[in-house]
Swiss-Prot record:
The keyword Calcium applies. Keywords: Calcium, Cytoplasm. SUPFAM superfamilies: Mss4-like. It comes from the Eukaryota. The keyword Nuclease does not apply. GO terms for molecular function: calcium ion binding. This is Translationally-controlled tumor protein homolog. GO terms for cellular component: cytoplasm.
């Protein structure tokens, strides 16, 4: 199994168990589905069951959302277009520092930066219609997943989550 992790935070963003594609060697796109599923009982540390009220059976709730967001425990955040542009400046610099730290050559760093710039140019015009997600750690310095709803053949919309390829580390499990 392949695991795609945020290079900067180590957060797990997605695995190859989902249907994904690489667009123009710069953006991973994952088609998601809305799901509703049961949530198991949560035991609180330090709770004394004998002191609690006796329950008849187990209460199970449900959670709804996008399968990828729920499975990877992504955390929704918000950006204005200006805030997102400012984030991109900081993020690009942090990525370049990380690439150099990891021993990438100047040519490899320039190629990765070029691909990242290409990816940004593709998504920036549509940024006002997108939702944003951080990894499980909610670290604002890491990669931000972009969610966009696209028209599909049946007349509805398909949720598509996008990640910049060069902000992810591909790890074999």
């Amino acid at each position: 199994m392949l695991l795609f992790k945020d290079i900067l935070t180590g957060d797990e963003m997605f695995t190859d168990s989902v249907k994904y594609k690489l667009v123009d060697d710069c953006i991973f796109e994952i088609e998601c589905e809305h799901v509703t599923r049961k949530v198991g009982e949560v035991a609180l540390d330090g709770a004394n069951p004998s002191a609690e009220e006796v329950e008849e059976g187990t209460e199970e709730g449900t959670e709804s959302g996008l399968d990828l967001v729920l499975n990877m425990r992504l955390v929704e955040t918000g950006f204005s277009k200006t805030d997102y542009k400012n984030y991109l400046k900081t993020y690009t610099k942090a990525l370049m520092d990380k690439w150099k730290e990891d021993g990438k050559s100047e040519a490899e760093v320039n190629e990765a930066k070029s691909k990242l710039t290409e990816a940004v140019k593709k998504v920036l015009p549509r940024i006002g219609d997108m939702q944003f997600f951080l990894g499980e750690s909610s670290n604002p310095d890491g990669i931000v997943a972009l969610l966009e709803y696209r028209p599909n053949k049946s007349g509805g919309e398909t949720p598509v989550v996008m990640f910049f390829k060069h902000g992810l580390l591909e790890e074999k499990q």
